[in-house]
From Swiss-Prot:
It comes from Cyriopagopus hainanus (Chinese bird spider). It is found in: Secreted. Gene3D superfamilies: Lipase, subunit A (2.10.80.10). This is U8-theraphotoxin-Hhn1c 3. Residues 1-21 form the signal peptide.
Length: 84
């Protein structure tokens, strides 16, 4: 009985952690992060660094596979951040 209670408690804590990373819009994310993912599972992710996967910035701030690049970097035609 005690083991089941502990397992349930750990599971609830893990679910709370997952929910805290979810986002619905850019406003839900802290500086240096964007809201990206599928319609059903968006998470705050860090902006892309040099050589990392990216999506070009858009006026709707809707991203599916990754975030735009950090400042002073641009998203290339192969969706990788590089020097501007």
């Amino acid at each position: 009985m005690k083991v089941a209670l502990i397992v349930c408690l750990v599971w609830v804590m893990a679910m709370m952690e997952l929910v805290s990373c979810e986002c619905w819009s850019q406003a839900d994310c802290s500086d240096g992060h964007c809201c990206a993912g599928s319609s059903f599972s968006k998470n705050c992710r860090p902006y892309g660094g040099d050589g990392e996967q990216c999506e070009p910035r858009n006026k709707y701030e809707v991203y599916s596979t990754g975030c735009p690049c950090e400042e002073n970097l641009m998203c290339s035609v192969i969706n990788r951040c590089q020097s501007a």
